[in-house]
Structure formats: C-alpha cells, structure tokens
C-alpha cells in the first residue's frame, strides 16, 4: 500500500440501459438543447442501437416517464428545507419553475 488516496465513484458502477442514457441526456435540466438537436440526438442513438430491436419501443415508453422523474428530482430542495439546509425562497421558485417546464415538455409527448 503506497498510502495514496484512492476514490471509487460507485454512482456510475455497472451498466445503464441505453434508453435511459439517451433519454436522460434530453431531460437533464443542465442541457439547453433546441428541439432540432434533441431530435438529432435521438435519431443518432436509434442508429447506434439499431440491432436492439426493442430500443425504439422502450424509448417511446420510458422517455415521458424519465421526464417526470427529472421533474421530481429538481424538487429535491423542497425535501431538505428546514433540515438545517438554508434553501432560499428564490432557489425553491427556480426549482419549481424547472419542474413545471419539464412537466409541460412531458405533456407534449403524451
């Protein structure tokens, strides 16, 4: 043992479903892609996984659900408010608007 510090990031440990990867890229609140780029991303991912015959069907089923998941994730600051975490009203308002925006995008898909 050399005494050096080693960090293992278990957050990305294992395999992810390509459908989830494709969808999360579109839904992540940090992404500010226009509709043309999002469509291009999905088209390219579909081509990459063309041999996966269930990819498109799984994507159609999962994509709106994963959008709702992200709409809930951005609301996490509401869970920690009052638990010693100093979350401002401004932050909560911003997160609520992000969630509403994601829900509106999901609504357009269903």
Residue ranges and their predicted role:
Residues 17-53, 64-83:
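Active-site activation/catalytic loop segments of kinase-like enzymes and analogous catalytic loops
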Residues 1-21:
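Active-site acidic catalytic loop and adjacent metal/ATP-binding pocket
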Residues 61:
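ATP-dependent phospho-/nucleotidyl transfer catalytic cores
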Residues 11, 16, 35-36, 44-47, ...:
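Glutamate identity and glutamate-enriched acidic tracts
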Residues 72-110:
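ATP/Mg2+ or Mg2+-diphosphate-binding catalytic cores
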């Amino acid at each position: 043992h050399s005494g050096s510090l080693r960090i293992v990031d278990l957050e990305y440990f294992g395999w992810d479903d390509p459908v989830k990867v494709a969808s999360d890229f579109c839904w992540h609140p940090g992404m500010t892609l226009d509709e043309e780029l999002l469509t291009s991303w999905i088209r390219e991912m579909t081509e990459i996984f063309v041999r996966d015959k269930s990819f498109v069907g799984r994507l159609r089923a999962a994509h709106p659900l994963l959008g709702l998941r992200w709409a809930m994730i951005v609301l996490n600051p509401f869970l920690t408010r009052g638990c010693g975490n100093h979350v401002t009203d401004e932050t909560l308002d911003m997160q609520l608007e992000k969630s509403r925006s994601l829900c509106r995008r999901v609504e357009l898909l269903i």
